[in-house]
A protein has these predicted regions:
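Membrane-embedded alpha-helical segments and adjacent helix-loop junctions characteristic
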Residues: 3-4, 31, 62, 66, ...
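Interfacial loop-to-helix junctions that mark the boundaries of transmembrane helices
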Residues: 6-10, 32-40, 52-57, 163-176, ...
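Generic alpha-helical transmembrane segments of integral inner-membrane proteins
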Residues: 17, 21, 47-51, 69, ...
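Structural signature of hydrophobic alpha-helical transmembrane segments
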Residues: 34-43, 173-186, 232-236, 306-312, ...
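Transmembrane alpha-helix interface/packing and boundary motifs in multi-pass membrane proteins
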Residues: 51-58, 189, 222-232, 265-277, ...
Length: 544
């Protein structure tokens, strides 16, 4: 039976209802041991966001904005929930030795207490000899001190959570990683406007001749390189227009058309792994790592990911040629085209080149890639290379999507939700191989059905919590698990909905879902093996 509300499909309607229920149940109806009230609120927001991102009753970027709105409303110090909240505390009476007298309502259902010491809340669990008499309770504990106060309502909304200013949540919209992405988007817009992308592509394809296997390799290399510094979505859209004249030379029903069409999104997804700005999961992982105080420069990231990208590109090239064999010996390629020489085009070339050079040499000059990204933002506008109409066409919704992901990860960490979610799993018993395999498989699996940005948002806080808990000792630590998550998210290529490049390629009408699934599944399996090998061998060597 089909049903819908507000013009939504059945799937979207169910997603809307289940998402709202997921938002309300944890803070209103649940009392999960070890999770603060703020953690319950965040769990509700997490469930709503995950369900909305999966079923899309509203656009995925709108879900991200809803996340920030709910955080400001329900978790900020200025919101109605915490604006006037004060912890109910009372003094602790010292009886003798390590014996204390407290109100009985201060005891939790698990016979522990929350105390306030130096304006911080602490959970005391080592209670002994608990005796309840009328309106008092006697307890023994070596962890309680003379000046401590006890919280008389263990379920109070401020227990184990100190609300932060709403500015912290709004600030994610201007997070340095967002600025980094905005700079990349503006460079991409300039490249398209002044035909730098198409002319550069034609120029770079010349060395590959006219044989099909080398043309495919050339297309994939050019796509991967552009995708490393531009949006992989924009790169795919541009490169699909480049290959259409090539595909037109093939006869109807020729399966090599499928291989050519798949080579672009697959190369874009793989190329995006190379740099921090290549794809949103990289930005989310990098932001999460930097928030812990660890630094990974632009060059560092490329050192980690270059072997993965090179091996994956060669593997994808070989797979596509084997599965969709060429039926033509040579292509007739039109390589005509000149670089524009107008003053604004020359300014674009200069800004593009300097920006990429500064990004690559970050370790040498010490200027953050986030700061460098503001050079094209200011330079392209100030010189008139991009005008207000160009700015309006930028993919702002992607920035909003990433900002919501960063903000959700912030609350999952601050409220203890991320740590609570993994506390019941003995991750330490899994071993290095099992940890890498589990995180990689989860990231690839989720990214095939959710956006890879959403997947990185959901999985990365778990990796940080494991690192914080000491389960990921160096050199197999935070950076390694972050790389596993970000790289694995980009290996999801089975379905048209898995990534925007896949969807763009599907829109040409050349591909069918089974064709994409066949190639994507093989590449995903090989990619996971490559990720595991790098995580266990290559990355630890670099980190050492």
């Amino acid at each position: 039976m089909k049903f819908s509300v507000f013009g939504l499909s059945t799937k979207q309607t169910v997603g809307l209802l289940v998402g709202v229920i997921g938002l309300l149940i944890p803070p209103i109806f649940l009392s999960l041991p070890g999770l603060s009230f703020a953690g319950h609120i965040t769990l509700g927001i997490f469930l709503m966001a995950a369900i909305f991102w999966m079923t899309e009753p509203i656009p995925i970027y709108a879900t991200s904005m809803s996340v920030i709105f709910l955080q400001v409303l329900l978790l900020s110090a200025q919101g109605p929930v915490y604006q006037d909240a004060e912890l109910p505390v009372t003094s602790i009476d010292h009886i003798e030795n390590e014996t204390w007298q407290i109100p009985p309502e201060a005891l939790t259902e698990h016979e522990s207490v929350w105390i306030v010491r130096d304006d911080e809340t602490k959970h005391i669990e080592d209670l002994r000899d608990i005796q309840k008499e009328n309106d008092i309770a006697r307890i023994s504990s070596p962890s309680i001190q003379e000046d401590d106060s006890v919280i008389t309502d263990p379920w109070h909304r401020k227990v184990d959570y100190e609300p932060t200013s709403y500015e912290q949540f709004f600030g994610t919209l201007a997070n340095p990683i967002i600025i980094l992405f905005l700079g990349g988007f503006m460079l991409a817009a300039g490249a398209v406007k002044y035909k730098l992308d198409r002319n550069l592509t034609r120029y770079l394809l010349k060395p590959f001749g006219t044989r099909p296997l080398y043309i495919v390799l050339g297309l994939m290399l050019v796509t991967a390189v552009l995708s490393a510094f531009m949006s992989n979505t924009a790169t795919t859209a541009m490169m699909m227009t480049v290959i259409l004249p090539i595909i037109a030379q093939l006869e109807t029903g020729d399966r090599f058309k499928i291989g050519l069409a798949l080579s672009i999104p697959f190369a874009a997804n793989i190329g995006g792994i190379l740099t921090p700005i290549g794809t949103p999961p990289n930005a989310i992982v990098l932001a999460a790592i930097q928030d812990t105080g660890r630094q990974v420069s632009f060059t560092d990231w490329m050192m980690y990911t270059t072997p993965v990208v090179v091996i994956m590109l060669l593997a994808a090239w070989w797979i596509l040629l084997k599965v969709f064999k060429p039926s033509i010996e040579n292509f007739n390629l039109n390589m005509k085209g000149e670089f524009l020489t107008s003053p604004k085009a020359i300014i674009l070339y200069f800004i593009f080149g300097i920006t990429v050079l500064l990004w690559i040499t970050e370790n040498q000059h010490g200027v953050s890639s986030n700061m460098v990204a503001f050079f094209p933002i200011a330079g392209l506008i100030a010189t008139g290379v991009l005008d207000k109409d160009d700015i309006r066409t930028l993919p702002w919704e992607v920035l909003w999507l990433v900002a919501g992901g960063i903000s959700l990860g912030l609350s999952m960490d601050q409220t203890g939700l991320a740590m609570w979610m993994i506390s019941g799993i003995n991750w330490a018993a899994l071993g290095a191989f099992a940890l890498v395999f589990t995180f990689g498989l989860i990231s690839i699996g989720l990214s095939n059905f959710l956006s890879n940005t959403v997947t990185a948002t959901l999985v990365m806080p778990l990796g940080i919590s494991l690192w914080s808990a000491g389960v990921l000792p160096e050199p197999f630590g935070l950076i390694t698990i972050g790389l596993v998550i970000s790289v694995s998210c980009s290996l999801a290529m089975i379905l048209p909905i898995s990534t925007p490049p896949n969807a763009i390629a599907m829109s040409t009408g050349i591909l069918r879902t089974p064709d994409m699934a066949k190639g994507g599944l093989i590449i995903g399996i090989i990619g996971l093996i490559i990720v595991i090998a790098n995580a266990l061998i290559y990355w630890p060597l670099l980190l050492n």
